[in-house]
Amino acid sequence: MSAFDLIVRGGTVVRGGCEVADVGVADGVISAVGPDLEGGAREEIDARGLLVLPGAIDAHVHFNEPGRTRWEGFASGTRALAAGGTTLCVEMPLNAHPPTTDGESFDLKLAAAKASAHVDFALWGGIVPGRVGRMEELAGRGVAGFKAFMSATGTPDFEAADDLTLYEGMQEAARLGLPVLVHAENRQITDALARRATSALRTTMRDYLASRPAVAELEAIGRAILLASEAGCSLHIVHVSTGRGVALVAAARERGVDVTCETCPHYLLFTDEDAVRIGAAAKCAPPLRPREEVESLWEQVLAGNVAFVTSDHSPCPPDMKAGEDMFRAWGGISGCQSLLPALLDEGYHGRGLPPERLAELLSANVARRFGFAGKGGIEEGNDADLALVDPSGEHVLREEDLHYRHPISPYVGRSFRGRVVRTILRGRTVFEGGRVVSGPAGRFVRPQREKGER
């Protein structure tokens, strides 16, 4: 009888450092890591010349199900994740209809995800006006935390949180022992500048970029940190687009505030000039920034002040990206399939980011922050979630390579150094040779988190 169900042989295993080793898997769990494992296996994979990374964890995706599967859906969205080396995602509460703001809406989303997810998943709940009293229902069902917007959401059925709603939501999250995630932009500034531009018929990409200045983000980050520190909750700032924003978070951590932040590949790879060149496919909020902001953000990533990198995959149908009016175009970037490839290309190859830091930014830190036990690292007892990467494999991303419902992405046409060749979920290959090779097998992951864990 074989000692293992699977052995991944001879790859460069990334865990703390890098070592050429085998990974033995039994019953979907990593049971041994070391050179020349003995005992045999029912399946062996030759990983010589490949990086063996923990499967990425994308803590920020919008799959729009139930109710808006014309936009994406768990089936196509998680196929794209598998193709990009991601084995666990956390799906956002807005854009679905109904949004995830109470127990009933959670149940609908959970059923949809269980039926069609190709990778494991967790779910965020929402903080919106009039629904703070329903947060306990969501906590009891296993949400990973709660998301709030400080600026307009673009979705009428998920309202932005006014300051009192945000503060009281933070107090409730603290009581429940769960984190609050905040989209931090000052709504008064962004709304007023947008009205000024559109009333003057200034609706180009440059006009849109100017309507969401960095100061709107910086002010909101500072305000969110203050409210969270007073409420006593764990705070996470999503999609920070400036190095100065990260610096505010780092300074607050030095003062003892329980706060972390993420950024996204599009803020690390693209500039405002790219947004002008690409058009609506590159519209997002906060927007893409000038080159000096990109460099400052990379400095913070390399200094260790950014906890992790997420895709903020936010797709829509093609008609919502059509036209020349950038204020009307949907503000979201499709990019979850490119999360790991983007960091391999620009981080590992372009900036000298070591593989072990790549694993921290895309896996370990996410699992630790949000309490995903058994995830995020290649260690005995953890789920056998692996991404096998050819670090020298170059490719140009084409529309036909994308697994999204709609092949719209600013990454199309970009050359990447580093290719995901196989994705393994709990010991089972789900992506290989450019194809998703298994049916929906994703499981719901509940957080196991102690209050104050950082």
Curated annotation (Swiss-Prot):
GO CC annotations, alphabetized: cytoplasm
Matches recorded under InterPro entries: Allantoinase, Allantoinase_bact, Amidohydro-rel, DHOase/Allantoinase_Hydrolase, Dihydroorotase_CS, Metal-dep_hydrolase_composite, Metal_Hydrolase
Keyword check for Transmembrane helix: no
Changes after translation: Carboxylation allows a single lysine to coordinate two zinc ions.
Transmembrane portions of the chain: none
EC number annotated for this UniProt entry: 3.5.2.5
Subunit-structure text: Homotetramer.
NCBIfam families assigned to the protein according to its UniProt record, in alphabetical order: allantoinase, pyrC_multi
Protein name: Allantoinase
Annotated organism of origin: Rubrobacter xylanophilus (strain DSM 9941 / JCM 11954 / NBRC 16129 / PRD-1)
